[in-house]
UniProtKB/Swiss-Prot annotation:
The keyword Heme does not apply. It comes from the Viruses. GO terms for biological process: DNA replication; viral DNA genome replication; viral transcription. Keywords: DNA replication, Viral DNA replication, Viral transcription. InterPro entries: DNA_clamp_sf, Sliding_clamp_C, Sliding_clamp_T4. Belongs to the Tevenvirinae sliding clamp family. This is Sliding clamp. The gene is 45. The lineage of its organism: Viruses, Duplodnaviria, Heunggongvirae, Uroviricota, Caudoviricetes. Homotrimer. Interacts with the viral DNA polymerase; this interaction constitutes the polymerase holoenzyme. Interacts with the sliding-clamp-loader; this interaction allows the sliding-clamp-loader to open the sliding clamp. Interacts with the viral DNA ligase. Part of the replicase complex that includes the DNA polymerase, the polymerase clamp, the clamp loader complex, the single-stranded DNA binding protein, the primase, the helicase and the helicase assembly factor. Interacts with the viral RNA polymerase (RNAP). GO terms for molecular function: DNA polymerase processivity factor activity. HAMAP family: Sliding_clamp_T4.
Length: 221
């Protein structure tokens, strides 16, 4: 089989969450960081024929780039990758027992109880992430202010050590309520697409996209 570009994009993103990954047979993949702060699921265009694990997903993807028109043949203990010009790569699987694996599903609360919910456009997410990197800001904040229903997404420093901020209005709250939630910037390094964002005050959020779903912990200050 050949991997679609969209599948490779998701795998690269998941490698940023955890380099180790167990991939199950089928077209749904999942990963979790070692701190249990971020869990991600994706429905991909490709369907893997077997279950296998890798210690270093980034290394695996880089190895595939060594071959032109890579064709993958998944065996019991390794995958054989062939390419143009007679090139061949044999990549050994890892022991799945030593790789952090995400649960099959996350039970997200149905009631937000003072939390937040809004639609986030991919271009707005991309701009805030770029601002965070450009200005060296470690946090991303979702907030409203007293007397306003406007929801703001901003790149900032939760500890106040930087005076730089960058913010975008991303929607309106259903009611006039005040809230403020912080994320570590690196945890919002998710694939740029439109998401339905739900944040629960207990410290968990869900970013639901067309084919992607991320559960990300908010930060207690």
């Amino acid at each position: 089989m050949k991997l679609n570009k969209s599948t490779i994009e998701v795998l690269k993103n998941f490698a940023g969450i955890n380099n180790g990954m167990v991939i199950h047979a089928g077209s749904r993949i999942r990963t979790q960081d070692n701190l249990n702060k971020q869990i991600a699921y994706a429905d991909i265009e490709d369907s893997f024929p077997v279950e296998f694990a890798v210690y270093d997903l980034g290394e695996f993807l880089s190895a595939l780039n060594l071959l032109d028109n890579a064709e993958l043949d998944f065996q019991e203990k390794f995958v054989v990758v062939t390419g143009d010009g007679g090139t061949k790569l044999t990549f050994q699987y890892a022991n799945a027992e030593f790789v952090t694996e995400a649960p099959e599903k996350v039970n997200f609360p149905t009631e937000l109880d003072g939390g937040a919910e809004f639609d986030l456009k991919g271009e707005d997410l991309q701009r805030v992430k770029k601002a965070s990197a450009t200005l060296g800001l470690s946090d991303i904040c979702v907030r409203t202010e007293a007397g306003s229903t406007a929801i703001t997404l901003s790149a900032t420093d939760a500890q106040g050590s930087s005076k730089h901020t960058f913010e975008i209005n991303v929607g309106e709250a259903d009611v006039d309520t005040e809230f403020k939630f912080f994320f570590k910037s690196e945890r919002l390094n998710i694939v740029d697409q439109d998401y339905k964002v739900s944040i629960h005050p207990a410290g968990i959020s869900r970013f639901l996209g067309l084919s992607l779903e991320y559960f990300i912990a908010t930060e207690a200050l």
